[in-house]
Structures are given as C-alpha cells and as structure tokens.
C-alpha cells in the first residue's frame, strides 16, 4: 500500500464574518487563490498531473453551491482534465477531503491530489436554508440540532464550570495573538486580498478574528448565549464566526520523491466515528482513540494536538477524557484555536491540520494528532508522522 504524504499546507487569514476583510471576496475566490498558490509553491508538480481535487464545504448553496470545488478549480485555471469534488461531513468536511484523497492514494488510484476546504460564513450563514425533518424528533432530541445547547449538556455532564470555560477562551486568544506576534503563522498564511474598514483593497497576512484584549474578567461579564436561565456557554467561549480557506498538497511518497518534492509528514492513520447527537462535541474522544489504535500509538506518544475549539465547554471534556488535562499548556492548541481564529466550517479540518504540521516541525516532534467534533454527533481524527 502506498504511503501518503503531505507535501505542503497553507491557508488564508481568517476574516471576520461580520463586515470583515473578505466581505467583498467570494468563497470560490478564496479557494482558487489557495489552489493557485499551492501549485506555484511546488512547480515540480504540473497542474495537469493532479488526479483529483477534494474540497470541503458545508453550506453548499449560493456562491458555495453547484460543486464549489470545480468552480474554484476553473477559476484557478487548473487544467480542465483535472476533476474536482465537494465533500460534506459538516465541521469535518475538509479533514474528510484529506481522508478521501489519502485512501485514493493508498490504493494506487491517485498519485497527487489537492485537498482543502472553505466556508464564507458572512455570505452564507450556517443556518441558511436548514430544514430538519420533523420526524427526527422521534429519535433525537430537538436540541441536538442546536450546537450551543449540546455544549451546555457536555459542560453539565463533565463538571466544566463557567470559570474554566472563560479561562480556556482567554488562553485561546492569548496563544493566537502570541503566535501572530512571533511570526508562527507566517509559514501557513498566504497573503490574501480583501478590504479594510475603510473599503481600501489590501493584502491581509494576519487573522483579523483574534481579540488580543480578551481577559477572563471581560469574558465573565458576558451573558449565556444559548441557555439564558442556567447556561454557562457564552459568545466569548464559542468559536468565532469567520471566513477562510485552507489547502494541502497530498501525494504518494514515491511520486513526491520522484519529483524532488520534500514530504513534510505522512498520514499515519485516520478515523471517523458517530456519537450521540445530544453530545456531538464529544466525538473527538472516540475518534482520537480509534485513530491512535490504528496507528499503534497511545496519547502519550503524541507530541502536539490540534483539537477544534467549537466551544470551551466542548473541548474541555474531550481533553479530560483523553487524559490530557495536565498537559494542556505543553501539547494542546499551542497557537490558539477556533475560539480565537474562528471556525469556518468547511475549512477547519484542513486549517487545524496545517497548523499542526507547522507546530510539529517547530517543536520537532514525531507524531501529531488533529481532531474535531461534528454537528449531529460525529468525530474525526488524523494522526500525522514527521518524515
């Protein structure tokens, strides 16, 4: 079976969804920009040699509809002979895109693929056009479709206090801002055109979603966002609404070396699981355990983790049940996470994987794990190994 390697991984800056940098930039343009950039950064691979493009996106309607993967590829002037498909596993879409491409390469059906994802939550809101079947309420609690309430449920089940959530959220912003100031994101962010507050067109090379002024004291003043009576989850401890895209060049190790391209990491194992929709945020626990089992590793073997921060109330139970509470500051989301950077749904799987690869190199660790929860009760995880 072919070894699957990540040759390159990049992303756009994360823009605020409400009047942010990309308010006049379409999702297809964000995607096409990264496709062009990946190919330009790796000229040894001709675009025509790509076997497929796998692109994650959740709200596949309006500008994100009608197979945005293909539309973006056409905009990027990828040869017409290269196919493209849009993947949807909700929050795990672009990580699923990676898994789909990896399996094609493992079986010998492909040698080189572009993978990634996008979500413009400012142009296509998360709730746009959603119409759940009424019959679902016979099998699933109605609140299972409200992500904030599933986070409230996890907080109650696992004893996650408001104070713990506020502290974790403040940490996310502090870590992300420190990473920005130190240049830790420079290797992953591709400058991207957008508009500043005055409408001036400029190139953005930083995440505008981060709020460096965030403090635990300020977060403590916010009202509960989903359960106004007894809730603990606030807007400040939830992932920010943002617009962005991320992309990776995935190849067989043999083809990469044949072309003189240096692999950055191998895909060691992959896993996806289902869980109770009412605690959808718990999905990373069984997904990570399964991925580790497939890799023949334990959590202690992993040097750094990237765990998507849908909510502080959601990620803390996952950290706890993976036995990592004492290692948060050494191993978990060292450059902040979605609470600070935002969670553009279809983009996030590739985004956290991209950040993870850079952290693995910076920390000089052999193994890294990226994982995320998925709305309606799923979890997805990938173990990477440095080459």
UniProtKB/Swiss-Prot annotation:
GO terms for cellular component: cytoplasm. InterPro entries: FadA (IPR012805), Thiolase (IPR002155), Thiolase-like (IPR016039), Thiolase-like_sf_Thiolase (IPR050215), Thiolase_acyl_enz_int_AS (IPR020615), Thiolase_AS (IPR020610), Thiolase_C (IPR020617), Thiolase_CS (IPR020613). It catalyses: an acyl-CoA + acetyl-CoA = a 3-oxoacyl-CoA + CoA. The keyword Cytoplasm applies. It is found in: Cytoplasm. Pathway: Lipid metabolism; fatty acid beta-oxidation. Its main location: cytoplasm. It comes from the Bacteria. One of its GO terms (biological process) is fatty acid beta-oxidation. Pfam families: Thiolase_C, Thiolase_N. Its EC number is 2.3.1.16. The active site is at residues 91, 343, 373. The keyword Acyltransferase applies. Keywords: Acyltransferase, Cytoplasm, Fatty acid metabolism, Lipid degradation, Lipid metabolism, Transferase. Belongs to the thiolase-like superfamily. Thiolase family. PANTHER family: 3-KETOACYL-COA THIOLASE FADA, 3-KETOACYL-COA THIOLASE, PEROXISOMAL. NCBIfam families: AcCoA-C-Actrans, fadA, PRK08947.1. Heterotetramer of two alpha chains (FadB) and two beta chains (FadA). Catalyzes the final step of fatty acid oxidation in which acetyl-CoA is released and the CoA ester of a fatty acid two carbons shorter is formed. This is 3-ketoacyl-CoA thiolase. It comes from Escherichia coli O1:K1 / APEC. The gene is fadA.
């Amino acid at each position: 079976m072919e070894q699957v390697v990540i040759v390159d991984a990049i992303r756009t800056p994360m823009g605020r969804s409400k009047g942010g940098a990309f308010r006049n930039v379409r999702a297809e343009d964000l995607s096409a920009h990264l496709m062009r950039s990946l190919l330009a950064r790796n000229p040894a691979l001709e675009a025509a040699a790509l076997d497929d493009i796998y692109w994650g996106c959740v709200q596949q309607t309006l500008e994100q509809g009608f197979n945005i993967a293909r539309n973006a590829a056409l905009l990027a002037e990828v040869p017409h002979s290269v196919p493209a498909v849009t993947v949807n596993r909700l929050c795990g879409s672009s990580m699923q895109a990676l898994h789909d491409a990896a399996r094609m390469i493992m079986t010998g059906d492909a040698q080189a693929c572009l993978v990634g994802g996008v979500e413009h939550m400012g142009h296509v809101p998360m709730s746009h056009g959603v119409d759940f079947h009424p019959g679902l309420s016979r099998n699933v609690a109605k609140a299972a479709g409200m992500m904030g309430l599933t986070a409230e449920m996890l907080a109650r089940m696992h004893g996650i206090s408001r104070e713990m959530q506020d502290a974790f959220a403040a940490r996310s912003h502090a870590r992300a801002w420190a990473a920005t100031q130190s240049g830790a994101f420079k290797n992953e962010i591709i400058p991207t055109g957008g508009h500043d507050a005055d409408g001036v067109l400029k190139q953005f090379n930083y995440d505008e979603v981060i709020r460096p002024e965030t403090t635990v004291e300020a977060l403590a003043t916010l009202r509960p966002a989903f359960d106004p009576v007894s809730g603990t989850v606030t807007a400040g401890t939830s992932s920010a609404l943002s617009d962005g895209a991320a992309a990776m060049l995935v190849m067989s190790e043999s083809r990469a070396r044949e072309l003189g391209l240096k692999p950055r990491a191998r895909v060691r194992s992959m896993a996806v699981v289902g869980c109770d929709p009412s605690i959808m945020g718990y999905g990373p626990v069984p997904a990570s355990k399964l991925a580790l089992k497939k890799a023949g590793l334990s959590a202690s073997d992993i040097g750094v983790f990237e765990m998507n921060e849908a909510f502080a109330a959601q990620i803390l139970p996952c950290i706890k049940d993976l036995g990592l509470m004492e290692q948060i500051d050494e191993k978990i989301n060292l450059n902040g996470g979605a609470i600070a950077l935002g969670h553009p749904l279809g983009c996030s799987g590739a985004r956290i994987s991209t950040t993870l690869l850079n952290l693995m190199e910076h920390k000089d660790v052999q193994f890294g794990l990226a994982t995320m929860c998925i709305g309606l009760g799923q979890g997805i995880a990938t173990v990477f190994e440095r080459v």
